[in-house]
Amino acid sequence: MTHQSIKKKSFLNLVLLILSGELIFLLPYVLARVFRPTFLEVFDLNNFELGSLFSVYGIVALLSYVYGGVISDKYPPRKLIAISLFFTAFGGVVFATYPSFLVLQILYGYWGFTTVFLFWGAMIKATRIWGGTNSQGQAFSFLDGGRGLVAASMSSIGVLIFSFFLVTEIELTTLSQRKEAFRYVILFSSFIVFFTGFIILFLMKNKEDTVQTTNNFSSISQIKKTLKIPSVWLIMIIIVSAYVGYKVTDIYSLYASEVMLFDDLESANIGRCNCTLDL
């Protein structure tokens, strides 16, 4: 294999990691962030109920982060990433039916498993493999910057789809019409997530598939050893603090609707711009 073909293959792997790294959270997070007023209305939720859904997701995700790393040491990242995208997309089909609050709680717990346990450790491992021994910083900077670009692009497409399927002016639409338009946004998002998993399964080919599996007990002992390092806990605090600040921006579209009295489409555009500013 020539050096040029290896370089192209490596670049393709990075692009696929960037796509999957953001699209995996499109259904559980990005839609609620961009379309917050519409989201609450079509699912008949209040802010407390939406927060409880995220809490269910967070509890499952917290456990998944710990044990997901063990799974990523045992199986090829390519397969884990693809499977997690497939399962997450299947949840989107249920999401599009506007299920009851109880089913939504189960669904968000399910997404906490599919987007973290099967995915996160595998994505981090695949990114480290791409970066090699000398380009770890470059690899993760490309990953995070690229994810921001994907979020901005997908939120713009989502707003466009929502506006396209609104048959009349937003002020004149009924709840059922807004639900139908938003259903297309959910189904499109589910399709994109599934299709990305399909591409990754067949196109992401590299040395990650030849990595030998690690004994589970060895991985768990390494986790325990790592948790004894003080700097690891400081990094945890930094990351949590950064995400707390980041999550505050989720209410911008709702603020635009309830305080500035923007309509649902204008509020969604505020949410879209918020994703763009994350770049």
Predicted regions: what they are:
Residues 1-9, 206-234:
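Juxtamembrane intracellular "pre-TM" segments in multi-pass secondary transporters
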Residues 13-45, 68, 154, 248-253:
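Extracytoplasmic
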Residues 32-36, 151, 155, 230-275:
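Extracytoplasmic gate region of multi-pass secondary transporters
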Residues 52-70, 272-279:
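Central cavity-lining transmembrane alpha-helices of secondary-active solute carriers
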Residues 86-100:
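C-terminal ends and interior cores of transmembrane alpha-helices
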Residues 108-146:
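Cytoplasmic helix-loop-helix junction between adjacent transmembrane helices
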Residues 138-166:
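Glycine-rich segments within core transmembrane alpha-helices of 12-TM secondary carriers
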Residues 158-167, 188-211:
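C-terminal membrane-cytosol helix-exit motif in multi-pass small-molecule transporters
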